[in-house]
Amino acid sequence: MVAKAYYFKGEYIEAKKTLDFIKNKYKKTEIAFESELWIAKCYIALEDYNFAESILDELRAKKRFPDKLNKELLLTFADLYIKQEVFSDALDELKSACNLIKRKSKKARYYYIIAQIYQDAGNSKQSKKYFELVLDANPEYDMVFNAKMNLARTLRTKKDLNQMKEKLLKMIKDEKNKDYLDQIYYTLGEMNIIEKDTTTAVENYSLSTKHSVENDIQKSLSFLQLGQIYYKKSEYPTSKIFYDSAYTFMPEIHQFYENTKETKEILEKLV
């Protein structure tokens, strides 16, 4: 469909024009309903959330709305709520969408989003549950890897932490993970922090920086963690070195950039 091509190129106004034409030409047909759904997506992309929600509400209320489009309607609602940061409603829509998907492998992506929402909310129990569902769905390796890294951060009991550390250490030896070593060592460092073992955390964060060749964001986060550890110890000269490095590698659009910059400037005055 030409309209979808416009949409995926980011040309939302052109996409909406085409979709409006289709909706009006083929009224009360399945393609008309689908066009309205994509018009709502365009409004979401344009950040006109109120108008997008009004379209979606109207579609949900229509008795003739095709069953085969229900999953996409739920996922579009979820996207809208995530953009608005109404995460409780987003979770409801995502879970309902998962109930309509039969193949586990197709559910993996949405389980992952659900897990991330719970993780960001600090709900380790539910986050752990959904990251485990991601792994159970046996998706592509990149998602498996990221789910394992995030799952490790949800663990709290000594038994769970030790079991996961064993798995991560095995992953380090696996050739297919050679490009992910920076993330594995970083995750080990995160687990060390949970255990209040800052000495080992420093070792793992340092290894993360050494193995981070092309991933500047990961490198910056590892340096940032090192900077924070030494800052809390009041070892300001050492902390400054790591904050300088974190600031150097961190892109300006990163959520931690401004805070990193401020702390770096404070350390410049202290040292």
Map each language-model feature to its residues.
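Acidic, polar-rich low-complexity tracts and alpha-helical solenoid repeat scaffolds
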Residues: 1-271
